[in-house]
Regions:
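Short, small-residue-biased leader/transition segments that mark boundaries at the very start
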Residues: 1-2
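Active-site metal-coordination/substrate-binding segment of hydrolases
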Residues: 10-11, 15-16
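Extended polybasic, low-complexity segments that bind anionic RNA or targeting/receptor surfaces
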Residues: 18-133
Length: 133
């Protein structure tokens, strides 16, 4: 046999530098994560980009109603934070471009900094203060 069929230069041969699955995850301490989120929220407050609302009690789960609420708040690219998983808010906001919903337990620094405005309910503010204060 003059050649090896598994050599990379032959049809059906191997790949020279094949992609290798890599884990790009970086461990971050709890205190660092909390401090980063505190800093991000403080930054939004200083820029007047954090809006506190009494509640987001929508009559129905309609995108149009959520759009009206966000237009009145002048929040075009917004992160809507609620205390618990409010299905009406989630269903109303999911079809609006550049609007994302989150609960107090699921917010992160990336989402806070990515959005221009952060809309938070009073219950969510109380929960955030309880956890991060």
């Amino acid at each position: 046999m003059l050649f090896r069929s598994r050599a990379p230069q032959w049809t059906g041969g191997g790949v020279v530098f094949a992609p290798v699955p890599r884990d790009y995850e970086v461990k971050m301490n709890k205190k660092e994560r909390r401090a980063a989120l505190k800093s991000a929220l403080t930054s939004k407050v200083q820029e007047n980009k954090l809006v506190v609302v009494d509640s987001l009690a929508l009559a129905e789960a309609k995108t149009k109603e959520m759009q009206k609420v966000l237009t009145n708040l002048k929040a075009d690219k917004a992160l809507v934070v609620t205390a618990d998983d409010d299905q009406k808010v989630v269903l109303s906001a999911r079809n609006i471009a550049d609007v994302q919903t989150a609960t107090v337990n699921t917010i992160n620094v990336y989402d806070v900094m990515k959005h221009n405005t952060v809309v938070v309910t009073k219950d969510a503010v109380a929960s955030i203060e309880e956890v991060y204060a």
